[in-house]
Amino acid sequence: MFDIGLNITSSQFDHDRDEMIARARAAGVDSMLFTGTSLEESDRACAFARRYAGCWSTAGVHPHDASTWNDESAARLRALASEPEVVAIGECGLDFNRNFSTPAEQEHAFTEQLRLAAALALPVFLHCRDAHARFLALLDPWLDKLPGAVLHCFTGTEQEARECLARGMYLGITGWVCDERRGLELRALLPIIPADRLLLETDAPYLLPRDLTPKPASRRNEPCWLPHILTQVAQWRGEDPAWLEAATDANAARLFLKNASPA
């Protein structure tokens, strides 16, 4: 099973990172993509991908950190993207919910990362929150120059999902869909996502599925819970879990591993 979104550099894993990876393996999660959210964290994510077999990483600047983008950022990302473990540019995009960086800073950093991904022929690992229309307006000119794109941790509306899917994008589904308070709209739209455009992720240590029983004492999410997300998504889509696992694994390999060196 392939978890396409694990925040491996989180300090929440500092005391048991090796054990967390071992638990994932024991649960059948044998492939993982580690998310880079800043230049420094992207470098660390790459180092961890080098350390753990069957793992890769992204390199990018999250919209929260867009204010750090400067004249040297693209060159540093380009150098990092030359590492065999790095298989996508991101996490990049727009987040107008918190605006930790200004909208102008976010749009500039996003556009420059799209430019870099196109130049390097790498897929993009995308973030969008409360910015759908502007997100698509900036993304659209680049889509035909990119080998692929996934909107990670999709939590939008059915209309937003359809607009992304019409552009050939993949949608990443997390344990958010297991939340009976705020995940019902996402759960209802699962059947409209073509099987060849669906990816699964935990976004660990965040977004622990609320319907886990018993819940882990730490309340921390881990990639070992990806099989639970898979089972629930398959049920709500009316599909066999083993079939959906094979389909989503194939999607992840097609998007991220076309040119990757064996991990």
Swiss-Prot record:
Transmembrane segments: none
CDD domains: TatD_DNAse
Native organism taxonomy: Bacteria, Pseudomonadati, Pseudomonadota, Gammaproteobacteria, Enterobacterales
Cofactor(s) listed in the protein's UniProt record: Mg(2+)
Protein name: 3'-5' ssDNA/RNA exonuclease TatD
Gene: tatD
Disulfide bonds: none
Family label: Belongs to the metallo-dependent hydrolases superfamily. TatD-type hydrolase family. TatD subfamily.
Role played: 3'-5' exonuclease that prefers single-stranded DNA and RNA. May play a role in the H(2)O(2)-induced DNA damage repair.
GO molecular function terms noted in the UniProt entry: 3'-5'-RNA exonuclease activity; magnesium ion binding; single-stranded DNA 3'-5' DNA exonuclease activity
GO cellular component terms given for this protein: cytoplasm
Organism in which the protein naturally occurs: Cronobacter turicensis (strain DSM 18703 / CCUG 55852 / LMG 23827 / z3032)
EC number: 3.1.11.-, 3.1.13.-
Keyword Transit peptide: no
